[in-house]
């Protein structure tokens, strides 16, 4: 079982995720024809991308598969492949490896006769395959009890001014979401109107770590605004905030858990 992927698409993926993590877990769902890429950033923050299987990302297998990919290592070795290469990614779960391979054929004039010259490249990278994550992505799409749009640069500017604090209070009032620093002196408050806000949600308040919000800084060059949702599970437990956007050709989700 392996994934065949165009090098341009692979470059996008590793360039993006290597800013946040040295490795990611890849989960291929052959039934839904989707590939999920997941990284745990620490501080109760998870990030994942959803990529449809297509001509540029093709899965050669019938069963679902989960494996780890060392994105930092892959990023540094892609210069070994031709710019038009289609790369096979084949995990070796038993030996804690992942293999990248590709070939390229060029025609060379030999005594006025074109001769095909084939170049094969294979790279084996070590990575612990015994700690792959099977992440329940659908859990965070079951229910939404609040929705707004947050301008990333303005949010980053706001939290830069309050770096002396550890968390923000999150409250809901009159169909608005309010982010506020603790206390009443030298207090900062940011308020967003919401396109969706359940009446039940406005009875609650939460806390979110500023260190978690700071992890959005890695998106600054790629994202202008995030669709932001307050998500809950099927038992109506409020889970946290889900930031979503489409970056280049794939959808990105960042989930942050509310603090107790």
From Swiss-Prot:
Signal peptide: none annotated. It holds the Pfam family Pox_TAP. InterPro entries: Pox_TAP. The keyword ATP-binding does not apply. Induction: Expressed in the intermediate phase of the viral replicative cycle. Keywords: Activator, Late protein, Transcription, Transcription regulation. It comes from the Viruses. The keyword Transcription applies. One of its GO terms (biological process) is regulation of DNA-templated transcription. Associates with RNA polymerase to initiate transcription from late gene promoters. Interacts with the late transcription factors VLTF-2 and VLTF-3. Interacts with the late transcription elongation factor VLTF-4. Interacts with itself. Belongs to the chordopoxvirinae VLTF-1 family. This is Late transcription factor 1. It comes from Vaccinia virus (strain Ankara). The gene is OPG093.
